[in-house]
Swiss-Prot record:
GO terms, molecular function: identical protein binding; lipopeptide binding; NAD+ nucleosidase activity, cyclic ADP-ribose generating; Toll-like receptor 2 binding; transmembrane signaling receptor activity
Family under the similarity heading: Belongs to the Toll-like receptor family.
Function text: Participates in the innate immune response to Gram-positive bacteria and fungi. Specifically recognizes diacylated and, to a lesser extent, triacylated lipopeptides. In response to diacylated lipopeptides, forms the activation cluster TLR2:TLR6:CD14:CD36, this cluster triggers signaling from the cell surface and subsequently is targeted to the Golgi in a lipid-raft dependent pathway. Acts via MYD88 and TRAF6, leading to NF-kappa-B activation, cytokine secretion and the inflammatory response.
Membrane topology value: Single-pass type I membrane protein
Protein name: Toll-like receptor 6
Main location: membrane
GO terms of biological process kind: cellular response to diacyl bacterial lipopeptide; inflammatory response; innate immune response; positive regulation of interleukin-1 beta production; positive regulation of NLRP3 inflammasome complex assembly; toll-like receptor signaling pathway
Organism (species): Dasypus novemcinctus
Length: 789
């Protein structure tokens, strides 16, 4: 029973005191004020270490059995105290005498039997309901609670003057728990509930309604009753009970929670209320027992505007469906809401209907609903979400007989459209919700012509065909959670101002949408897998320049999904150079760079002789590499000279004035035939001997060298030594150019060497001499072993 009552009371409290609680909590936002939640913590006594500045204290759903002054006296600033669902049996309200700021006190769902009173001043909410009081716990001190807004009470007996101490108060809500109420048969009690706007009566669960109390309430505008169990016999008691409560013209809203009744009794209750001033009748959790047969009902003039029934359960399954549906379809009211029921159909009214609003959410209706129905001429809103609708074409035909229909909700069905035929819709529809269906691109060939708000989110749409019927009046389009790959243009939606297209497959949206949709005031396109490439730059530039009021969720919902290096990057933080994105610009840049390079190389070659410098550096590098690859011991074992010089006598002046001074100044030993050849030995023997004792053989080539026979011999033996010793010991210096035709045919060795080997060319420019000598010295530089004594 507790489980049943908790949501009921919470709902009622929400209606009655939400403003009070919110307003109070807002005042507790300062850092030095506290809200303590100790609910469901197994407390058996009030903790002693509560912060003295506590403003809100929740100790509900614990095991507290008593409350003493010392428990809360130090909480002088306490404003809200919740002690519901505990084990309190006795309570002296004087425990709160030091809590003068207390405004909200909830003592419901305890075991209170007795209560001692104490005056309060600021109390606005007092809940003593769902306790074990025999009579209503009303103290005379309650008469001073001029700010009291909500009062919750419990009693097993009622007396007419129980509420006299608070007769002068103007309450907003009274919750009266009558779960333990009992009166002997044929006895009637009276209770005058003077001034309250809302009255909530909670009866015992499982017991047939038998309360016989004459209640009268002044200014009652809202009546709510919970746990009503009726059968054909005691149905009269409910109507008798309501007779006094429904007399006043101010009762406009009547709600029944957890109602179990027979069909016959339900019809009688409807007939009873049909002539009362009640305008809004709500029934939540209705259970129909026994058979459903045709019952006579008079649809006389009524003040009732709206009937809402939410969640119907039937205990019988074989009955007259027409009797059930006819009762509701013929009602002469403006608004009918029957939701969460096993209804599979609803009949078309036989005569012109007064319905302006119909809500049949979460039933089992099929495509045959209101088929060929022409009596719903005043219907403006029709809600058919969460049913079994499948064929959109048939639904369009259904609306043909509803000339006033403006709002149609078909969401959460299984609608498809795969016909080539043109759909027929009533022309009055302005708002159409077809979200969460199975619709594809073809749906754009089956839309009402004057629709202004269209919701197609969560379908199977991949694109918007360009040849669809023009929807010139469409202002809002929600097409989120589909599979679109690009933003739609406004060619067919010239009045579009709001577009919701997030959660699609848009990777590189075009800017045509922005250009063609000049009336856009709101666009939501985040949560798409954007590919951050060159194609996206223009879109980012355009959308980032738009107002944040227009581009919703920018920039947080707009992130790169590809490539991996940019995944998760906000679009506003994605940057790529113009050069990377423009082929023509890249071509021009590369061409210009190559042109500058060619001009530079040409200048260096012509004016600075760059090739000569390159050859010299290359030769020096190769020489150093070869020298590192030859074992030092092998080079040093017989060497006495760094170089053997071979030259023509006509070139001796250059050798003595240029070559020797630049080589021998760094302890380099040069072998010259005129100073080192051994007298008495043959010239050939001296040549061979000193070539073998030299690390390198330097030949100064010129036209004079070609004409010298001894120079040729020296070259021959040096070349022979090259192959014999298996390392490179020849260095050719071209002092002057030697034309090939000037070399005698019998000097084939010289011809082949000049043709095949790299030589050092003596530069005419003096600025190049330094590099020449450095290169030559590096080629012959080696540490010679000292002669053994």
């Amino acid at each position: 029973m507790t489980k049943d009552k908790e949501p009921i009371v919470k709902n009622f409290h929400l209606v009655c005191i939400v403003t009070l609680i919110v307003g109070t909590i807002i005042q507790f936002s300062d850092a030095d004020e506290f809200a303590i939640d100790m609910s469901k913590t197994g407390l058996t006594h009030v903790p002693k270490d509560l912060p003295p500045k506590t403003k809100v204290l929740d100790m509900s759903q614990n095991y507290l059995s008593e409350l003493q002054i010392s428990d809360i006296s130090f909480l002088s600033g306490l404003k809200i105290l919740v002690l519901s669902h505990n084990r309190l049996q006795l309570l002296d309200l004087s425990v709160f005498k030091f809590n003068q700021d207390l405004e909200y006190l909830d003592l419901s769902h305890n075991q209170l039997k007795k209560m001692s009173c104490h005056p309060f001043v600021n109390l606005k909410h007092l809940d003593l309901s769902f306790n074990d009081f025999d009579s209503l716990p009303i103290c005379k001190e309650f008469g001073n609670l001029t700010q009291l807004d909500f009062l919750g009470l419990s009693a097993t007996k009622l007396q007419q003057l129980d509420l006299l101490p608070i007769a002068h108060l103007h309450l907003n809500c009274i919750l009266l728990d009558l779960k333990g109420y009992y009166v002997k048969q044929n006895e009637t009690e009276s209770l005058q509930i003077l001034n309250t706007k809302k009255l909530h009566l909670v009866f015992h669960t499982g017991s047939f309604f038998s309360v016989q109390v004459n209640m009268s309430v002044n200014t009652l505008g809202c009546l709510e009753m919970t746990n009503i169990k009726l059968n054909d016999k005691n149905c009269y008691f409910l109507m008798k009970f309501l007779l006094e409560l429904t007399k006043g013209p101010s009762l406009l809203n009547f709600t029944l929670n957890h109602m179990e009744t027979t069909w016959k009794c339900l019809v009688r209750v409807f007939q009873f209320l049909w002539t009362k001033p009640v305008e809004y009748l709500n029934i939540y959790n209705l259970t129909i027992v026994d058979d459903i047969n045709k019952e006579y009902f008079i649809y006389c003039k009524t003040a009732l505007k709206a009937l809402k029934i939410e969640h119907i359960t039937k205990t019988v399954f074989i009955f007259s469906w027409s009797s059930l549906y006819t009762l509701f379809s013929e009602m002469n009211i403006m608004m009918l809401s029957i939701t969460d029921t096993p209804f599979i159909h609803m009949l078309c009214p036989k005569t012109r209907s007064t319905f302006k609003f119909l809500d049949f959410t979460q039933n089992v209706f099929t495509d045959s609903i209101f088929e060929n129905c022409s009596t719903l001429v005043e219907l403006e809103t029709l809600i058919l979400q969460k049913n079994g609708l499948k064929d959109l074409f048939k639904i369009g035909l259904m609306t043909k007989g509803m000339p006033s229909l403006e709002i149609l909700d078909l969401s959460w069905n299984s609608l498809v459209f795969n016909r080539q035929r043109k759909c027929i819709w009533v022309g009055s529809i302005l708002m159409l919700n077809m979200s969460s269906n199975l619709l594809t691109d073809l749906v754009f060939r089956c839309l009402p012509p004057r629709v202004t708000v269209l919701d197609l989110h969560n379908n199977r749409i991949m694109s918007i065909p360009k040849d669809v019927t023009s929807l010139e009046t469409l202002q809002e389009l929600n097409i989120a959670f589909n599979s679109l790959t690009d933003l739609p243009g406004c060619g067919t939606f010239s009045s579009l101002s709001v577009l919701i297209i997030d959660y699609n497959l848009i990777s590189h949206p075009s800017t045509d949408f922005i250009q063609s949709c000049q009336n856009i005031t709101s666009i939501k396109a985040g949560k798409n897998p954007f590919q951050c490439t060159c194609d996206l730059r223009e879109f980012i530039k355009t959308i980032s320049q738009m107002s944040s009021e227009v581009v919703k969720d920018w920039p947080d919902s707009y992130k790169c999904d590809y490539p991996e290096s940019y995944k998760g990057t906000l679009l506003q933080d994605f940057h790529i150079s113009q050069l990377s994105c423009s082929t023509s610009l890249l071509t021009v840049t590369i061409g210009a760079t190559m042109l500058v390079l060619v001009v530079t190389v040409t200048f260096l070659c012509i004016y600075l002789d760059l090739p000569w410098y390159i050859r010299m550096v290359y030769q020096w590098t190769q020489t150093r590499r070869r020298a590192r690859n030859i074992p030092l011991e092998e080079l040093q074992r017989t060497l006495q000279f760094h170089a053997f010089i071979s030259y023509s006598g006509h070139d001796s002046a250059w050798v003595k004035t240029e070559l020797l001074p630049n080589l021998e100044k760094e302890d380099i030993q040069i072998c010259l035939h005129e100073r080192n050849f051994v007298p008495g030995k043959s010239i050939i023997e001296n040549i061979i001997n000193f070539i073998e004792k030299s690390y390198k053989s330097i030949f100064v080539l010129s036209p004079n060298f070609v004409q010298s026979e001894w120079c040729h011999y020296e070259l021959y033996f040096a070349h022979h030594n090259l192959f014999h010793e298996a390392f490179d010991n020849l260095i050719l210096i071209l002092l002057e150019p030697i034309p090939q035709y000037s070399i005698p045919n019998n000097y084939h060795k010289l011809k082949s060497l000049i043709a095949q080997r790299t030589y050092l060319e003596w530069p005419k420019e003096k600025s190049k001499h330094g590099l020449f000598w450095a290169n030559l010295r590096a080629a012959i530089n080696i540490k010679l072993m000292e002669e053994k004594k």
